[in-house]
Amino acid sequence: VSGSDQTHWDDVYTSKAEAEVSWFQEEPEVSLSLLELVGARPDDAIVDIGGGASRLVDCLLDKGFTRVSVLDLSAAALAAAQARLGERAKAANWIAADARSWEPPESYDIWHDRAAFHFLTDAGDQQAYVERLNRGLAVGGHAIVGTFAPDGPEKCSGLPVVRHDADSLSRLFGPGYVVVDSRRHAHKTPWGAVQKFQFSTFRRVA
């Protein structure tokens, strides 16, 4: 089983309540502050990669954002988010797809990923993801990528991860991406454990 295994994630999202997964956040404060940092506007096209049942989409809709897409490998995760939002779910675009093979249908201003990329432990999978990033993010746009930090957990949801910092992501993303912010975050799980995250924000310049 790998982090790119759809069955694993469907099982997670159908067997556990929203607040029973380690990555649950009532409000994604770091992501929201970084969106503010990069000057996100309500009409910006934003894609949340591996968004699952995250509440980021709720917060963006609350703030008046009108072009929000949520991509996840697990249709069950997206269904959970849609059920939570009810009628409001129609205001977002829901994409059940693999970030390594998905063909972005438009050019996004902001590419957000909290804890999806770090599940890609294979160099080929990482490169496939970066190819989609290159196809999907507009030049001048921003990529906000949250991963476990170098001193963070080695596994999540029972699966191995690759821990990153801004330097390791820069090497993978290439010279077309410039770091504009790098910060650590101690995420507290619903049961009180602390997971060390690293959020790296890039501006695409080429």
Tell me the role of every PLM-derived stretch.
Residues 115-119:
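Short catalytic micro-motifs in class I SAM-dependent methyltransferases
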Residues 112:
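A conserved beta-strand element that flanks and buttresses the S-adenosyl-L-methionine
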Residues 1-106, 120-136, 142-206:
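Class I (Rossmann-like) S-adenosyl-L-methionine-dependent methyltransferase catalytic domain
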